[in-house]
Amino acid sequence: MTLASIRRGYHVIKTLLQYGLDDVLPPKMTPWYFTLARNSLFWIRNKHKDKSGGERLKLAMQELGPVYIKLGQMLSTRRDLLSDEWATELAMLQDKVPPFDGALARLAIEAELKAPIETFFDDFNETPLASASISQVHTATLKSNGKAVVLKVLRPNVETKIQADLLLMSQTAKVIDYLLGEGNRLRPAEVIEDYRVTILGELNLKLEALNAIKLRNNFIDSDALYIPYVYEEFCYPRLMVMERIYGIPVSDIVALKAQGTNFKLLAERGVELFFTQVFRDNFFHADMHPGNIFISRENPENPYYIGLDCGIMGTLSEVDKRYLAENFLAFFNRDYHRIAQLYIESGWVSEKTDLQAFEQAIKVVCEPMFNKPLDEISFGHVLLELFRTARHFDIVVQPQLVLLEKTLLYIEGLGRQLYPQLDLWQTAKPFLEQWMAEQVGPKAMFKKVSTKLPYWSDKLPEFPELIYDNLKLGRKLLSSQQQMLDKYLKYQQQAHKSNYLLITSAILLICGTLLFNQDATLLSPYVCLISGAVLWIIGWRSRPKNRKF
């Protein structure tokens, strides 16, 4: 551990103590040596006793900077781990930081291009259009076609700073894991590892560019979603160039109302887009907060979404998709037994789980939701409550399912903000039922066979040889089995004979011993003893030598 990391660790602990966050630790995590270290190394006391624990954590993360802000934002989606109060407070964290010098941005861009900016772009504006904790955006005009573009560039040395903070987080999480012991629900090391994978993915703008290109191609003919064009030839790990868009932020309800936007259609399209990305394309935008979503200015009666920032994308396996769809359908059919079965069948919880106890726990949580009208039931909260319940049965929450839950909560909140009467179930149910119908039956089977056709057509010429080899192997196997059977029968015969002789010898030896104490002829006991000994020797020598068949 370097001096810099020790200094940073001290600063982090000092900040957390300033906000009194040691007060929320359970007693088992504050043994005497912890208290001694706290009082000798840190003489700071809680300066914010008037604030709740969740608010203090939010303020501490805000003060610690971008990496901790992003961690807080991610934790706000883990309501299966945190209380609603804490999660709500962390959701208020804003990834807003002062911009860095435009001259430094120019140097960073030119380092990636390996040429002056003016070689490829005109009108480069050193004043950023927007800035965030990881990157900054500048406007320019493409020299080759005169089109307006934006250049997204990483902050100087951001990778080093993030790696240092991640290392510190990881080490701290392991210590907390150790203090909490086996069976703790928080699993801090697991949470930090998920966060590490997510944030490191955001540090590669080339990967983000490829994600954007793929998402754009998936919706190239869509009238519901537009992804700006990415100029791949100008994309590098620390630089990304894409088409500039001119939309209205989805959070600007006043501007959307002023242009006469069809809010009902917009809200329904948002839900359809989510389920299309998840179930049709298996590739969904997992960072759909309001800052990344804009609405088109033209044709407000037929509005479409404009999606930005494809740094975090989610995918699900075919198995996860199927179980997820069945979960939602089973929930709205109030089939809690099926939900419990699905969690076990999918491997999300152990097959050793008590099915009846799990079903009862799900029923206790889900049944009260039906006291509301269907159009007020939240998909995201259904998924959240199911995960939270399953947590008590040692669920292994997959990172992609956490991303899905977060995205679903964003989409629902957005949809109901745009159109409070949105009936999410009526919008999504036909889509889910159609998708499930496509997964079973003759059409689904034909489709699966069709996708495998090139593979099997390539293997078809090998079939005659494979059949011949298998028949040949079968004959050898039958012959081998017959030999094994013969050996086994011979072994059994030898064993029976040996056992018979040994038992008979034992009887004769016992009889000979008893006859010594009886009024028998002097010869009788000796005949029995000698016969018994001879039979024992013959029986012992006739035992099967081994059991290898």
Swiss-Prot record:
- All residue ranges annotated as the Protein kinase domain in the record: 123-501
Q: What are the alphabetically sorted keywords of the record? A: ATP-binding, Cell inner membrane, Cell membrane, Kinase, Membrane, Nucleotide-binding, Transferase, Transmembrane, Transmembrane helix, Ubiquinone biosynthesis
In terms of domain of life, where is this protein from? Bacteria
Catalytic positions? D287
Cellular localization per UniProt: Cell inner membrane
Question: EC?
Answer: 2.7.-.-
This entry's Gene Ontology molecular function terms read: ATP binding; protein kinase activity
Q: State whether keyword Hydrolase applies.
A: no
Which Pfam families did the record assign?
ABC1
Q: What does this protein do?
A: Is probably a protein kinase regulator of UbiI activity which is involved in aerobic coenzyme Q (ubiquinone) biosynthesis.
Entry protein name: Probable protein kinase UbiB
Which species expresses this protein natively?
Shewanella oneidensis (strain ATCC 700550 / JCM 31522 / CIP 106686 / LMG 19005 / NCIMB 14063 / MR-1)
* Gene expressing this chain: ubiB
